[in-house]
UniProtKB/Swiss-Prot annotation:
Residues 461-480 are annotated as: Disordered. It comes from Methanothermobacter thermautotrophicus (strain ATCC 29096 / DSM 1053 / JCM 10044 / NBRC 100330 / Delta H) (Methanobacterium thermoautotrophicum). This is Uncharacterized protein MTH_1137. NCBIfam families: monoFe_hyd_HmdC. It holds the Pfam family Fibrillarin_2. To M.jannaschii MJ0787. InterPro entries: HcgG-like. It comes from the Archaea.
């Protein structure tokens, strides 16, 4: 594994071979640790490429705090929704705000769900429902982030201050909280020695099982810690539990001798190991955010003033304190560190709509966590988006079942060109396997085309050929053509150029 990872720094083909293999956590962390800082960055960036990882960069936004007025919470949620940012639900704060207005906590969650359409990411949720804390915790000024490492245990004994009797009062609403959410966070830090910081692992496992019962994605929060043993224990616990996404927390919880080397290495290792292809951070100083983004971070959880994520990402010891409005700062950092490619940085609602359309076209039963060939079809987004009003709103012209019907009726036949070689093309080829004579896969990105052809050849009986990034050649050689993209502008451009192509949106 050491040699393969060293080679994968500059060779995406080797990275693709690693994806095909069983990956041992200790071997991966050990091999990544041996790399220079620049090679860790390059390795992580390689594993962010399709289909090795999710290649999007996004904001997740904490909109709440226990002492916010309801009007401010709702406005924060509406603003996040408008810019297409997932809303990070700190359940204890939602509960505190709701009760101050004479509402049951879940009623406020319902109202936010009815008012917005982006994913809701549920955190601080325990075996009874929303965790509940005293004012000394909910109003904490961020002492650990303000002072910086080393973290030696929460000075307020956070997890031991839970108000369990109040939590139990909401038990009857527990399932509805999860039903209304798109994803649920669990905390792995107790296995990394942070017993004062998070609930016991057994409770996290209960929450994970509840999330799975309702078909939700699960993300695992873990510390960078010492940058080696703590990473191994966190990754192993998460993979054993079956989580989808790793969320890495640095800041005061990055105790490594070289903080930035450790953060870059943690991101790169997570990129190789995470099943759902997404790596995020919920807490990182500005320099960690920057190096993490260069090393392949997909998401940064930030927040509005008073929300603790508002100061946990993008600031420094001495400036990271409650009251900071981290959202615009983190957006600026993202745009300085990540080049826009096919999508803007950070992604916006139009990209969520295209993703939702891709899932709807493919069918939820055909995408992540389903695999095809060597890897998953899609990423954790594809499991979370169906639990949103945005998914319900998005319309498609036809789905893969309609394509199968067209093939059975002879309207799609012979040699079939598929324009676009990303995940939807995988599902199309899989469903038309045996119904047509052969496929030619064409994509303007030669790497995307090459890896898709390799993956489909491993799975299908029907012959699969590369189109060599030549749209006109692929079209002229085919009897039928399908545009697989769900980005409306690109679909219209291709179908306008090539007559009689079948489109999905």
């Amino acid at each position: 594994m050491h040699e393969l990872i060293r080679e994968a720094v500059d060779n995406p083909g080797t990275a693709w071979e690693i994806i095909k293999m069983d990956r041992d956590v200790t071997e991966v962390v050990d091999a990544v640790s041996d790399l220079s800082r620049e090679d860790k960055i390059k390795l992580g960036a390689t594993f962010k490429r399709f289909p090795l990882g999710c290649d999007l960069t996004e904001l997740i936004v904490g909109t709440c705090a226990s002492d916010l007025e309801k009007i401010d919470l709702m406005g924060n949620c509406m603003l996040s929704d408008t810019i297409g940012a997932t809303i990070h639900v700190c359940a204890y704060a939602f509960a505190d705000i709701a009760e101050s207005y004479g509402m049951r906590p879940v009623e406020l969650m319902r109202e936010v769900r009815e008012t917005t359409e982006v994913p809701l990411d549920l955190d601080h949720f325990g075996r009874y429902g929303p965790m509940r804390f005293p004012r000394s915790i909910t109003g904490c000024g961020g002492q650990c982030y303000l002072e910086g490492p080393p973290f030696e245990g929460c000075p307020r004994e956070r997890i031991h201050a839970r108000l369990l009797d109040r939590e139990k009062e909401g038990l009857s609403d527990r399932e509805e909280w999860v039903e209304l959410s798109s994803s649920v966070a669990v905390n792995l830090t107790p296995v990394q020695g942070a017993e004062t910081h998070a609930a016991p692992l057994e409770e996290a496992e209960e929450v994970l099982e509840l999330a799975r019962k309702h078909g939700k994605g699960v993300e695992a929060i873990m510390f960078v810690g010492d940058g080696y043993d703590d990473l191994i224990s966190g990754f192993e616990a998460g993979l054993e539990m079956g989580v989808d996404v790793f969320v890495l927390e640095g800041g005061p919880f990055n105790l490594a001798g070289d903080r930035l080397d450790a953060f870059a290495g943690a991101v790169a290792a997570a990129r190789i190991l995470t099943p759902g292809k997404i790596v995020a951070t919920n807490g990182a100083y500005e320099d960690e955010c920057r190096i993490g983004l260069r090393a392949g971070l997909n998401a940064i959880i930030t927040g509005f003033p008073k929300n603790h994520h508002g100061y946990m990402c993008g600031y420094t010891p001495g400036t990271a304190r409650r009251g900071k409005f981290g959202l615009p700062r983190v957006m600026k950092i993202m745009r300085e560190e990540v080049e826009s490619g096919l999508t803007p940085v950070p992604i916006q609602k139009a990209q969520l709509e295209a993703l939702a359309a891709a899932v709807k076209v493919s069918g939820t039963e055909n995408v992540y966590p389903r695999t095809l060939g060597y890897t998953y079809v899609g990423d954790a987004h594809w499991a979370c988006l169906p639990s949103t009003p945005l998914y319900e709103r998005v319309e498609v012209k036809r789905d893969v079942n309609a394509l199968v019907k067209m093939a059975e009726d002879g309207d799609i036949h012979g040699r079939v060109a598929i324009f676009g070689a990303r995940f939807v093309s995988w599902v199309i080829a899989d469903k038309l396997d045996g119904l047509v004579d052969e496929f030619v896969i064409v994509d303007r990105d030669p790497w995307v085309e090459q890896v898709t052809v390799d993956n489909l050849r491993s799975e299908l009986r029907t012959d699969v050929h590369p189109g060599n990034s030549d749209d006109e050649g692929a079209y002229s050689s085919a009897d039928s053509s399908i545009v697989s993209t769900t980005i409306p502008q690109i679909s219209a451009k291709i179908s306008g150029k090539f007559r009689d192509t079948v489109t999905l949106v």
